[in-house]
Amino acid sequence: MKLSMKSLAALLMMLNGAVMASENVNTPENRQFLKQQENLSRQLREKPDHQLKAWAEKQVLENPLQRSDNHFLDELVRKQQASQDGKPRQGALYFVSFSIPEEGLKRMLGETRHFGIPATLRGMVNNDLKTTAEAVLSLVKDGATDGVQIDPTLFSQYGIRTVPALVVFCSQGYDIIRGNLRVGQALEKVAATGDCRQVAHDLLAGKGDSGK
């Protein structure tokens, strides 16, 4: 299996994502780390590092992925490209973790998919790509991983230290609803009193834009 430079950048982002796994994510050290990863990804796209690419290919060969796992990685690469093309100005994100009991996590992923809201994880399971892919695929219905993303920077951006948490964002700012509520109930709270109430109304009506 050969890695494109875009795939390599995504793989490095995921491998390093576990550094953000502590609860105290919004620290100078973590912000500096994220900036370094952003610079590294840009450098890899502009000037390929063949030695680093060879190392990553060796990791993939020694830890082969199943077809479903490859699809999971492809989805992550696609989402990374989309986020680089331009972030949406409004939408919602639902922050979860594998520390949530499986039954509850399955329900949450089903609800976020229903509303078109990305379920956002901080990092990988045991810092391992294959284990993470298998864990996600065991939770989602019909292998549909399109509603799941891994992005530790979003946890830092919105100051998310406990999960689950819903973030609805818009040009006026963002609203955060914390706690184990149904996704629909959390959206209703934002729709009632939030700064981004119109976005929440649209999501409840099935015509909102999901965040990336």
Curated annotation (Swiss-Prot):
Pfam families: TrbC_Ftype. The keyword Signal applies. Residues 1-21 form the signal peptide. One of its GO terms (cellular component) is periplasmic space. InterPro entries: T4SS_TrbC, T4SS_TrbC_subgr. It is found in: Periplasm. Keywords: Conjugation, Periplasm, Plasmid, Signal. Essential for F plasmid conjugative transfer, participates in F-pilus assembly. This is Periplasmic protein TrbC. It comes from Escherichia coli (strain K12).
